[in-house]
A protein has these predicted regions:
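Non-catalytic terminal extensions of PLP-dependent enzymes
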Residues: 5, 29-32, 46, 51-60, ...
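Long, structured ligand/cofactor-binding scaffold of large enzymes
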Residues: 182-279
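Conserved acidic residues
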Residues: 56-59, 118-123, 130, 230, ...
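Short beta-alpha junction loops
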Residues: 13-15, 100-108, 127-128, 360-369
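Conserved acidic segment of CheY-like receiver
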Residues: 3-31, 40, 60, 271
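Short acidic, S/G/P-rich loop/turn micro-motifs used as interaction or catalytic elements
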Residues: 13-22, 64-77, 104-107, 333-337
Length: 662
């Protein structure tokens, strides 16, 4: 199919009637005559914003004017602008073609750091516009073909082929929908391409998901390389299924298994299905309802053996000789708490054969140095001597996968290689023979998007946006002052004023830098108690917003604003959050986040504060809620908040829920 990737030309004479303008427009017209779109601009404008076009452009043509050059090219405004623009583009995109277009200047007039990033140097009036256009288009086409990962490229080729389909699915490339009025709506909503690409495993050129061959197998191997794994298996029905695959491959009835008690339901289902006998590692929890990490001491081999001895279901087992088959850890928690996986590997290597990190919420961490060793598999890390490492990741949660896109990553140990045939038996057990190819394509594309430098830039943008949001929230709080109220964002007290924060600020510890409790016994910001040095950190892209009314010790204030009312208010005003607690709600800064989105959230929180302070009637500020719950329509917003807050305080719900959990 024809994609819209214009060739971007930046020339201050693009719209002028002088010879330079006539020359560059002649090239643009020749490019358009070949079927490519041209986007012309006369200035670089905001360099960083214009460079965002790198994701939409098939090539850049940057004009340099002779009169702009003066002695000392490193200081010339033309060179400075050129260098800045190229750096911005290359920060995200190492491959998009960049051409320089000029009258008499040659490569000897430009510094080498600029030259090495160029695909060509075009001289005005030397070659015909048609030849120049063909030369640029050749590289543009090569670039667009080169960025297509294996399976997505094969799927595009198949959809373009126009073959008649005599296999399932029954809608036959969407044709069946065209025979019904409601089907017409469905077809128009999803579009031709999605339906033409919805095929079955009879299409040999696409490969077989269940056999991991052909284009699909090539894509899985490519993803394994990008994610620092030895093996990758795409999963089309979510990480719930990925977890079950790992367990059915590694665990047999009666096996002892070590499990994070803060595990996903799929792990509990895996325990039931495999007939394993679990011992649980107990996490912490603060009174905001935020589940914290498991203490490092619980990962000690002797601590695990003590749990085995204490388990009545394992009374027949010799705790000193039995080896648990698998350890499964939620990495990260829903709220963003991470573990130093290298420390865990060192502690358990050889004692537990299979180390499984459920990284449903952490597929992005491998692509930015901010996360250090706080994710399962990283570049240039020593692999365990005996234990095989598994990571199950939800590509759809924080990367650019569509819903249910997941993958299993496996890293061999030094002396144990994954038995792929045996693993595939578990894979077959949990996979459909009719997988959704759009999900496979999104796994393939999501992996390609994370290839550095693009992936690193995407994650860095997420981190920067989350930090800027936190800074903006603190600024609002400071301006309101101590006599007024505002929402807080849970996280470290120290925050750098600009840029990427120091990762050490996000490591969970007591106030003391050595991880030692302060002499006054005061907890640090997380309230999870003593933390082993360097063992846990908070992912900054996971933001928990705290509403007034409850402190970190579980004590209720005289007034309060339950989070459930805030999030219902936000939903009515076009802001939908990830989850809601008693006095907190949770948002994520994924790679799809924008400044407009988080600034809109902040302004809606301002609007809530105004309505709360004025005690606006519910029928006015939350009409949809009142339509379903007319009992509250005559109440004021502040009155309703106080009513629910009083009930929470009366029954001490924060302490009660913590006690129930622990």
């Amino acid at each position: 199919m024809k994609f819209r990737f214009p060739i971007v030309i930046i020339d201050e004479d693009f719209r002028s009637d002088n010879s330079s303008g006539l020359g560059i427009r002649a090239v643009a017209e020749a490019i358009e005559a070949e079927g490519f779109e041209v986007l012309g601009a006369t200035t670089y404008g905001d360099l960083s914003q214009f460079a965002q076009q790198q994701s939409r452009a098939s090539a850049f043509v940057l004009s340099i004017d002779d009169e702009e050059f003066t002695p000392g090219p490193d200081l010339d405004p033309a060179v400075v602008n050129l260098r800045s623009f190229i750096e911005e583009v290359r920060w995200k995109n190492a491959d998009v073609p960049i051409y320089i277009y000029g009258e008499t200047k040659t490569s000897r007039h430009l510094p080498n750091d600029i030259l090495r990033e160029l695909h060509g140097f075009i001289h005005m009036f030397e070659d015909t516009p048609d030849f120049v256009a063909k030369h640029i288009i050749r590289d543009a086409k090569k670039y667009l073909e080169g960025i297509q990962p294996p399976f997505f490229k094969a799927l595009l080729d198949y959809a373009e082929d126009g073959s008649y389909s005599w296999h399932c699915p029954g809608h036959s490339g969407g044709v069946a929908f065209l025979k019904s009025p409601i089907g017409q709506m469905y077809h128009q909503f999803y579009g031709e391409n999605m339906l033409r690409a919805d095929v079955c495993n009879s299409v040999e050129e696409l490969g077989q998901l269940l056999d991991h061959n052909g284009a699909i197998g090539e894509s899985e191997r490519n993803a394994a390389r990008i994610f620092n794994a030895d093996h990758c298996f795409f999963v089309t029905n979510g990480t719930s299924t990925s977890n079950k695959m790992v367990w059915h491959h590694t665990v047999a009835p009666g096996d002892v298994v070590v499990v994070d008690r803060n595990c996903h339901k799929s792990i509990l289902h895996s325990i039931i299905m495999t007939g394993a006998i679990p011992v649980f590692m107990k996490p912490t929890r603060n009174h905001y309802g935020i589940i914290g990490p498991i203490q490092k001491s619980e990962f000690e081999i002797e601590a695990i053996r003590a749990k085995i001895r204490a388990n009545p279901l394992l009374s027949h087992v010799d705790a000193d000789t039995v080896k648990p088959r698998i350890m499964t850890l939620t990495q990260s928690t829903y709220d963003g708490v991470l573990y130093n996986t290298e420390t865990i590997k060192e502690m358990l290597d050889g004692y537990i054969d299979n180390l499984h990190f459920d990284e449903a919420w952490l597929p992005h961490a491998a692509f930015h140095p901010f996360y250090g060793k706080f994710h399962a598999m990283g570049r240039k890390r020593a692999r365990p001597a005996r234990s095989v490492t598994y990571s199950t990741q939800s590509i759809h949660k924080l990367l650019a996968g569509i819903s249910q896109a997941s993958q299993v990553l496996v890293q061999d140990s030094q002396d144990t290689k994954l038995d792929r045939h045996l693993f595939n038996e578990a894979y077959l057990m949990h996979s459909s023979t009719s997988p959704q190819y759009s999900i496979i394509a999104s796994c393939d594309v999501a992996a390609a998007m994370m290839e550095p430098p693009g992936g690193t830039a995407l994650v860095e943008e997420s981190i920067l946006e989350s930090l800027d949001f936190r800074r903006a929230m603190r600024k609002v709080d400071e301006e309101y002052g101590a006599d007024d109220w505002w929402f807080q964002v849970w996280g470290p007290d120290e925050l750098d004023e600009e840029g990427i924060d120091n990762p050490q600020n996000w490591v969970l510890k007591r106030t003391d830098a050595e991880g030692v409790q302060r002499s006054d016994g005061e907890d640090s910001w997380h309230a999870f108690g003593d933390m082993a040095r360097g063992f846990n950190m908070l992912d900054p892209i996971k933001a928990t917003i705290i509403t007034p009314g409850l402190d970190i010790d579980g004590k209720f204030g005289e007034t309060g604003i339950p989070a459930s009312i805030v999030t219902k208010y936000l939903a009515e005003h076009g802001v939908v959050v990830e989850k809601t607690g008693l006095y907190s709600f949770f948002i994520m800064f994924t790679i799809g986040i924008t400044k407009g989105r988080w600034n809109s959230l902040l302004t809606e929180l301002q609007q809530f504060k105004d309505d709360y302070d004025r005690n606006q009637p519910m029928w006015r500020c939350m009409p949809e809620f009142c339509e379903k719950q007319p009992l509250y329509e005559k109440m004021g917003l502040r009155d309703l908040c106080q009513h629910v807050h009083t009930l929470y305080a009366k029954y001490d719900v924060a302490i009660l829920s913590t006690d129930m959990y622990l």
